[in-house]
Amino acid sequence: MAVGKNKRLSKGKKGLKKKIIDPFTRKDWFDIKAPSTFENRNVGKTLINRSTGMKNAADGLKGRIVEVNLADLQGSEDHSYRNVKLRVDEVQGKNLLTNFHGLSFTSDKLRSLVRKWQSLVEANVTVKTADDYVLRVFALAFTKRQANQVKKTTYAQSSKLREVRKKMSEIMQREVSAVTLAQLTSKLIPEVIGREIEKSTQTIFPLQNVHIRKVKVLKQPKFDLGALLALHGESGGEEKGRKVNTGFKDVVLESV
């Protein structure tokens, strides 16, 4: 049997292990700040390779999209079924100033809404806000039993569904086009548009579980640093945002 070289045997210094360098020593951490529309502005942290030579770290950070659960931004589990996308638009020191970039429902929430014996109504519109953001807004609703109804099912006729869908599109077009993106975010959090749709369609067919399930930013205007700083309260250092007005007043009961 021919005897060959044993490649597993180390040959002097060649067998020594190379020095392992931790890649995180060449990276910097940055704090992600949400707009003041939300209660909790500290979203989290992200990292990137440190600036070297002609390569600036800020260029790699701008445009990053982060997805956060709305419950974390509002500090309430009542909003846990919605996720918000934020886009990094500006770097200030170690703070990343973000802007609203989209909203979506979680898949488990959508599945929990679909039930038998009812009709699903969906509508979507492409609309421009007052500050020239082009958005595509998706809404969904479900039919519900009418007052004193005996029949188990709540299926609606096609003609009724078309009327409801047209009304939903009109309301979304009107509500979104009249406000800025920041004002629209304040409407989306307490679901003002969904309640308006539910109220306006009562004469056509009663609805339930009316939601704006998704918002996509298709086009954004030219970047305005002043508007972004105003959205963040002139500086990215504040940790708390302003409280969103839900449009309802607390009812005070008289003592008996």
UniProtKB/Swiss-Prot annotation:
Q: Name one GO molecular function term.
A: structural constituent of ribosome
Q: Name one GO biological process term.
A: translation
Q: Which UniProt keywords apply?
A: Acetylation, Cytoplasm, Ribonucleoprotein, Ribosomal protein
Residues annotated as carrying N-acetylalanine in the record are A2
Q: What is this protein called?
A: Small ribosomal subunit protein eS1A
Which Pfam family would be a valid example here? Ribosomal_S3Ae
Localisation: Cytoplasm
Identify its protein family.
Belongs to the eukaryotic ribosomal protein eS1 family.
A single GO CC term for this protein reads: cytosolic small ribosomal subunit
- Whom does it interact with, and what assembly results? Component of the small ribosomal subunit. Mature ribosomes consist of a small (40S) and a large (60S) subunit. The 40S subunit contains about 33 different proteins and 1 molecule of RNA (18S). The 60S subunit contains about 49 different proteins and 3 molecules of RNA (25S, 5.8S and 5S).
Q: Quick check: keyword Ribonucleoprotein in the entry?
A: yes
Q: Which PANTHER family match?
A: 40S RIBOSOMAL PROTEIN S3A (PTHR11830)
